[in-house]
Amino acid sequence: MFLTNLTLTNYRNYEHETLSFDQGVNIILGENAQGKTNMMEAIYVLAMAKSHRTTNDKDLIRWNEDYAKIEGRAEKRSGSLALELTISKKGKKARCNHIEQQRLSQYVGHLNVVMFAPEDLNLVKGSPQVRRRFIDMEIGQVSPVYIHDLSQYQKLLQQRNHYLKMMQAREQHDEAVLDVLTEQLMVLAAKITLRRRQFLALLEQWAMPIHHEISRGAERLHIRYEPSVDVSEKAELSRIVEAYSETFAAMREREIQRGTTLVGPHRDDIAFIVNGKNVQTFGSQGQQRTTALAVKLAEIELIFSELGDYPILLLDDVLSELDDFRQTHLLDAIRKKVQTFVTTTSIDGIKHDLIQEAAIYRVHSGSVAAPS
């Protein structure tokens, strides 16, 4: 798939901008704080209905304006696609082919993107929350049902935590209510756990050979899912539900004492293991970068294998972070098949053959000069 055009209205520092894009490589060139990353973020938000940089949607609206709008047209194997996302202080409204989507989970997945930015090193060395967010966003692109289940889980988790807080303060003591909340929560938790495990197994299949090649055959990558309940790697949904039931029963008194839910997908983690060692703890910066790059390239292939279209690749100020060998491997992997957007302050750090192929856009103070 590829994005043919993009219109931004009141988005961050863009008042109104309409752009057409090349099917291959598009380089967004400009100094810092001019709007390069904002444009990259807008493409991501158009696809995912949320930002990778902020959890506050109000940050996306231009100063002193009431709303922001992102519009785009994409070409997919199945045909042309018109997308529109309006962000206001009241929330978000999404349209696909001019039809309003009742839920954002119905909207996400029409346009697929893979983002690779310097902060993606945190995928390997950052907190478990970063890795959970990563897996949730990526599964959501290929499974709208997962987004719905995750949303329901988060709502139930808030309700259960609130009730546990009241039990902790002795404002409530009816354990039958807690039983109902727990039963509803553990079914959703089991579905999420199973889908995460399946997704990570697929991701590992794609990432292992890519990582082996980037490391010049010196390293072997494994991706290990670490759920908050003890279940075998081949456990079916019913067994995972049982495991949650047993664990919740064992943890009940501690949860009431603490006033919070101590078990569930919100406590999961992912470990990246290279040559038998956790890269987060024992890996060098080079190994962490190689792992992050392999995972991002694996995402591209996984999405293609699931959906039949390659996603759009967003490289936000990341090429300068990669040495020549890793840059070459990245560019060879995407050339001729993946529409790519690259932001940079200078083309000096980008390989010459890529520059020759690229359409170059120059950004200054929220205004974009398209290629002549």
From Swiss-Prot:
Keywords in alphabetical order: ATP-binding, Cytoplasm, DNA damage, DNA repair, DNA replication, DNA-binding, Nucleotide-binding, SOS response
MF annotations from Gene Ontology: ATP binding; single-stranded DNA binding
InterPro entries attached to this UniProt entry: DNA-binding_RecF, DNA-binding_RecF_CS, P-loop_NTPase, RecF/RecN/SMC_N, RecF_2
GO terms for cellular component: cytoplasm
Source organism, top-level taxon: Bacteria
Predominant location category: cytoplasm
Localization, UniProt: Cytoplasm
Pfam families in the cross-refs: SMC_N
Residues reported to bind ATP: 30-37
UniProt-listed GO biological process terms: DNA replication; DNA synthesis involved in DNA repair; double-strand break repair; SOS response
Keyword DNA repair: yes
NCBIfam families for the chain: recf
Function summary: The RecF protein is involved in DNA metabolism; it is required for DNA replication and normal SOS inducibility. RecF binds preferentially to single-stranded, linear DNA. It also seems to bind ATP.
Family of the protein in this entry: Belongs to the RecF family.
Protein name listed in UniProt: DNA replication and repair protein RecF
Gene: recF
